[in-house]
Amino acid sequence: MREETYYSVRMRASRNAPHEQGGKHISGGERLITYSGLQEAVDGLLHKGFSHSRGIPDFMQIQLESINEPIETIRPLPVAFHQSDTPEKGQAIARKLLQKAGIPPHMIEKAYENIAEYAEARGAVLFDIRAGERIDGRGNRGVRVSRMDWPSHDFQKWAFTHNMPENSRIKEAHAIAAKVCAHPGIIAELCWSDDPDYITGYVAAKKLGYQRIAKMKNAGDESGCRIFFTDGSIDTESCIHFLEKQPVFIQREENI
């Protein structure tokens, strides 16, 4: 990594009130960037916050802080795509993939039984597959995977190689999945967006890579889900610290 100061720039946007006061989540995003790219990063996050299909926010916060610790480098995950023409078929594919990742079927069903509750969390939930319960203790806040980015030139080369669209949604989702799967105690992630216009979701796992599923909900549905399945061996606080605080670059090549 070059000896240059990087900054974490994070945006969150909501409507009717800030998130912690019960406001409706509209959008969020972040970048890891050097000083020369700050203006472009802030402009991009501002545009993202005001162009989301969940509505126009009346609260937005953009936060900047310098990164004063080494930035870890993580390789992108292998990628695959599964066609599904109904949410039911998409969710069935997700269940099969979670089982292939090593999660017992009865624990998959136990997590699914609580999805309506988990969907209320603004971030992810940690689900222990030994105890069969949520363990993060964060309530509606959840766990927010943060302080990661995928340098644009590197992402563009990856997208070209894998015949993937060069859009920010895939870049951001894959970056989150790669960071999550890099933690040794997390077996898999199950995710679909709360964006009513975006119906594609994914299962990500060390064993499987990043497995996109075409349709996991109906258009117009504003409910989303993000569950991290843990193996029961983790120290919860250190896991959350890694997910929220450890700066990470996703990088397929040797040099940023």
From Swiss-Prot:
Cofactor(s) of this protein: Mg(2+)
GO biological process: biotin biosynthetic process
Enzyme class: ligase
Keyword annotations of the record: ATP-binding, Biotin biosynthesis, Ligase, Magnesium, Nucleotide-binding
EC number: 6.2.1.14
Gene Ontology MF terms in the entry: 6-carboxyhexanoate-CoA ligase activity; ATP binding; magnesium ion binding
Pathway assigned in UniProt: Metabolic intermediate metabolism; pimeloyl-CoA biosynthesis; pimeloyl-CoA from pimelate: step 1/1
TM ranges: none
Recorded catalytic activity of this chain's protein: heptanedioate + ATP + CoA = 6-carboxyhexanoyl-CoA + AMP + diphosphate
InterPro entries: BioW
Pfam families: BioW
Coiled coil: none
Subunit annotation: Homodimer.
NCBIfam families associated with the record: bioW, PRK01322.1
Annotated function: Catalyzes the transformation of pimelate into pimeloyl-CoA with concomitant hydrolysis of ATP to AMP.
Stated family: Belongs to the BioW family.
Protein name in the entry: 6-carboxyhexanoate--CoA ligase
Species whose genome carries this gene: Bacillus velezensis (strain DSM 23117 / BGSC 10A6 / LMG 26770 / FZB42) (Bacillus amyloliquefaciens subsp. plantarum)
Biological classification of the source: Bacteria, Bacillati, Bacillota, Bacilli, Bacillales
